[in-house]
Amino acid sequence: MKLSARNQLKGKIARVEKGRTTGHVQIDIGKGIIITASITNEAIDELKLKKGNDAVAVIKASDVIVGKL
């Protein structure tokens, strides 16, 4: 898969949790760092996302959400 986005973090899916319409996918990128993405349940199904799959988190600056730790 080729993308123009430069902020790509490779890892393994640690967890997939589906809600009513939107799900959360956690990607373990190593060193104890987990990236969580909110995507539609339809996207989870179409991509056949499962725990243990190799995955990549693609981050666009316009889509980054900041939370307080």
Language-model region placement:
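Non-catalytic connector elements of ABC transporters
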Residues: 1-69
